[in-house]
Amino acid sequence: MIIGICGFIGSGKDTIADYLVNLHHFRRESFAATLKDAVAQVFGWDRTMLEGRTKQAREWREQVDPWWAERLHMPTLTPRWILQYWGTEVCRAGFHDDIWIASLENKLRHSQDDVVISDCRFPNEIRAIKKAGGRVIRVARGPEPAWYDAAVSVNRGANGNSTWALSQRKLEKFGVHASETAWVGTEF
């Protein structure tokens, strides 16, 4: 069985994944694992910190890396921004929209384990899990963000096409990245 989890930052996706791993012996995987491996190698950042599973790691990912910011002349460069930009604009848009799906499929193709994927962020990831016979759930905690209705409107207006680029342009004023909004309004 494959279970995919969607939700906003801090909604409890990792808590549910931990529950499935610890009590039901699921194998934990993520679409972004390969991305985080590559970014850790290129930038010399701690792989565990890139995961962002602790408060300290989440805070660290939001901090400007002074060496890289100066070296690349990008004063606001943070690990989180690199993960979002490299994962979405560079690899998904610049190479192939399904790159992270294919990477995980390749990793799992001979596995018989029950798997939980706690980082579903795009409609094509949700479709891939469903196509593989899995289920996708949304975790909600607290009120919807201020940009939620705008994201639903933008995403549904694309008639099921990949909408991450459109979402990013339309929602820029809210300061959220497409990886946080692309799944909003998707049928589970």
Predicted regions: what is each one?
Residues 5, 117:
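Hydrophobic anchor at the beta1->P-loop junction of P-loop NTPases
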Residues 33-113:
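ATP-dependent small-molecule kinase phosphotransfer cores
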Residues 6-9, 104, 127-131, 139-188:
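Small-molecule kinase domains that catalyze NTP-dependent phosphoryl transfer to phosphate-bearing small molecules
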Residues 24, 131-133:
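Short, structured coil segments at secondary-structure junctions
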Residues 1-3:
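Extreme N-terminal starter segment of soluble prokaryotic enzymes
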Residues 22-29:
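Post-Walker A helix-loop "phosphate-sensing" segment adjacent to the P-loop in P-loop NTPases
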Residues 13:
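Conserved lysine of the Walker
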Residues 16:
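Hydrophobic positions on the alpha1 helix immediately C-terminal to the Walker A/P-loop
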